[in-house]
């Protein structure tokens, strides 16, 4: 589930690795290897340092920020994780994936009203994208943000009537599994998706 936050933040956002400094990509990749299985704080702190180096080399490198958020969450530093998330805003003001992640991070930090505003904005942006050029990732995350916004588990069948033939069976099953988990333990699932232990 940890990798889902990367999907939420980065899928459908072209951060074009070719345009990112190779040294920044290398530092980010080193941070991922260093973090390993998120088992010890020394490795996580080293991974945060490497993420900071990647960000210093390439301030718009969203994946480095997303990884740093995961490492901070694994250390239980959710306020710092929120501040890191908010640093990405200038690079992603209209990116529904970023706004969804921001909403979850705000909710994790007990800022429910701001989180709800973010969920509403993300839902609107996903709707626009689904009307223009629908993708599996957009629909999957649209269903997810609807649940977070309305605290209601919508039927995939109903949503797929409006947006038919987008989800493959495997992605549909994954989406349904996440939604089933959410309906029982919303806070736990959000915490886990953000990289918290």
Question: In which residue ranges do the predicted regions lie?
Answer:
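Short coil turns that delineate tetratricopeptide repeat
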Residues: 59, 92-93, 127, 167
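Residue-level recognition of tetratricopeptide repeat
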Residues: 32, 36, 70, 104, ...
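Canonical positions in the second alpha-helix
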Residues: 53-54, 87-88, 122, 129, ...
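Terminal, low-structured helical/coil segments at or just beyond the last alpha-helical repeat
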Residues: 148-197
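Structural motif corresponding to the intra-repeat A-B loop/turn of tetratricopeptide repeats
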Residues: 41, 75, 109, 149-151
């Amino acid at each position: 589930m940890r990798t889902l936050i990367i999907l939420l933040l980065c899928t459908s956002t072209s951060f074009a690795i070719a345009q990112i400094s190779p040294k920044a990509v290398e530092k980010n990749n080193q941070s991922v290897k260093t973090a390993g299985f998120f088992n010890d704080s020394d490795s996580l702190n080293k991974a945060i340092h490497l993420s900071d180096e990647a960000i210093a080399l390439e301030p718009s490198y969203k994946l480095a920020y997303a990884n740093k958020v995961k490492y901070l969450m694994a250390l239980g530093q959710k306020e710092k994780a929120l501040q890191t998330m908010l640093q990405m805003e200038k690079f992603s003001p209209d990116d529904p994936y970023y706004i969804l992640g921001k909403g979850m991070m705000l909710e994790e930090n007990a800022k429910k009203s701001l989180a709800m505003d973010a969920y509403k904005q993300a839902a609107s942006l996903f709707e626009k994208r689904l009307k223009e050029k629908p993708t599996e990732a957009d629909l999957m995350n649209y269903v997810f943000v609807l649940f977070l916004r309305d605290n209601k588990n919508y039927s995939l069948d109903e949503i797929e009537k409006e947006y038919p033939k987008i989800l493959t069976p495997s992605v549909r099953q994954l989406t349904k599994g996440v939604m089933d988990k959410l309906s029982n333990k919303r806070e736990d699932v959000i915490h886990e998706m953000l990289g918290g232990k």
